[in-house]
Amino acid sequence: MEPYALGTLGYTLDPGIPGDKLEAIREAMDFAISHTNTLGAFSGNVYVTYGAGTPTADASYRGQIRFGGSIGRRVALHELAHWFGSGTTDEWDRLVRDGRFIGTRTVTRITAFDGPSAYLNAGGYHFWPYGLNYDNEFSDTQRNTQLVSTQVADMGLGQDVTAAIAGTRRFQNRSSRHVLQSVVSAGYPSEAASVTGGTQEWRVTFADGFITLANGADGRMIKATASGDNAAAMMATADGSTAQQWEMMPTGDGWFLLRNRATRNCLDNIGDLAAGAPVRLWGCGWHPNQQWRLIR
């Protein structure tokens, strides 16, 4: 079983970065690059430098990211948005009207996240919500990356590469190292010790930042039954409900949570590491029991 990411985005560190700044910059960029590659087929190489006179940080379109007075994971993700063209291109300016970003893909994505009346504020070089403009905004970071991807597509600078998750996938749990499966005779998802066939394959569909997981053996989908801790996950025929939709939330190094759209709890083995044990639902955190990665 080999782990992999959807994207190939990388970065190069300026050899002149001061030694007392280097480790913090490397840690921030490692997280931001892994986070981004987990969510989509992003590509390119970011040149990363440091400027003692830079108040916080800045970036140019497909050029460099320069850290200054602010170094951290949030800052790295925020500047990556600028590197991809958000707020740094003429195409961005043409799609900002009356303080809102009006690109159709982005409008569809933000309303999927926040409801039919939602819109993406935009002004100067920045957007909000999910712009990661301040330290108190460092949550739901996956939505920042999702919205940057749609902005790139709206601006005509590339595709919505977060859609690359669609296809046949396998998922491995971090704590058990077992593979997500659905036994045809069972009514719930579980874990297998090894890859043996279609029961560990999942046909992933993607729409507006959310995915569905249909088992390769019988086509049934993973569905949440309730909110809260230790709620059951079940296998059910496709019904189009938000209880069958999941949001990938990167935690680092290619791992991610799968948060249900309806109940907002996450797929979790709840500490039962035995092969065949049911996968259930638990309030989302960073525990290895609820972290997953793609394998092949």
Regions found by a protein language model. Give the residues of each.
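Catalytic Zn2+-binding segment of zinc metalloproteases
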Residues: 80-97
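Structural recognition of the beta-strand scaffold that forms the well-ordered cores
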Residues: 11, 46-48, 64-67, 82-86, ...
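Lectin-like carbohydrate-binding module/patch detector with strong preference for beta-trefoil
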Residues: 162-296
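Active-site scaffold of zinc-dependent metalloenzymes
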Residues: 49-72
